[in-house]
Regions:
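Glycan-recognition and catalytic cores of secretory/periplasmic carbohydrate-active enzymes
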Residues: 1-237
Length: 237
């Protein structure tokens, strides 16, 4: 970690490698929280203070992501970094940015659709009106944890509603998932069910299955709603 950190700037974190060379990213990348999150877990396991210092430094690089919302990925980015920092250290300086990020995520929630918006409309995807991807299930943990901290019920309500609506529309009878379900934002009507990263529109996307298993297991842990546990078990089979 220490050697890798030497190749980073004040605003970048590792994203991947290409031909053995580190590929960094800015904080706006959806994976930006994974590096500080990995550092926090390593510190938790080892107690190494140098690792803790790296975790603190790289968590702070994501502060801007607690103040603006670019997409649903704010959950990945902030829960992995600020969420783990707060959970592991108990340092109150991480509390308000974490809670603020959760409230920002709720601004992407459309009560008519019953879901948080994944991607903003763009020239790349002009045919989608209100795309929601199964990945969003991973980002609900930001809401449930923030609800524990601040007690604002709307955070948990959004998480519940999103999970229930996803359960209704994003699964086939055999509990495989559609990657993308596009909605009409004014009515909540389903427009299409497709893939964006999987093999085909009708195939099971392995990563999507994992997102669903984690998301519904987490929702059961936080709410004790047995319907969530049953969903996680069915998806995992």
């Amino acid at each position: 970690f220490a050697e890798m950190d030497k190749n980073l700037t004040e605003t970048t974190v590792p994203k991947s490698t290409r031909f053995g060379v580190l590929v960094p990213s800015e904080s706006k990348s959806w994976t930006s929280g994974f590096y500080p999150g990995s550092l926090w877990y390593t510190y938790l396991y080892t107690g190494n203070e140098e690792i803790k210092a790296l975790a603190e430094k790289n968590t702070e690089k994501l502060y801007i992501e607690t103040q603006i919302v670019r997409s649903h990925d704010i959950g990945f980015m902030v829960n992995c970094s600020y969420g783990n920092a707060l959970r592991i250290t108990g340092d109150e300086k991480y509390r308000e940015p974490f809670i603020n990020a959760a409230h920002l995520l709720t601004t992407r929630f459309n009560p008519t659709v019953g879901l948080t918006l994944s991607w903003n409309q763009s020239k790349k995807r002009p045919h989608w009106h209100y795309p929601v991807i199964i990945d969003n299930m991973m980002n609900l943990e930001l809401l449930t944890q923030a609800h524990k901290l601040c007690g604002v019920d709307s955070l948990l309500t959004v998480a519940h509603t999103h999970a229930k609506t996803t359960m209704k529309n994003h699964f086939r009878p055999d509990f495989t998932t559609w990657h993308v379900v596009d909605y009409e934002p004014e009515t909540g009507e389903v427009r299409m069910k497709v893939t964006h990263q999987g093999y085909s529109d009708d195939s099971a996307w392995a990563r999507g299955q994992a997102w669903a298993v984690y998301g519904y297991t987490m929702m059961f842990r936080e709410t004790e709603d047995a319907e969530y546990l049953a969903q996680a078990e069915n998806v995992a089979r």
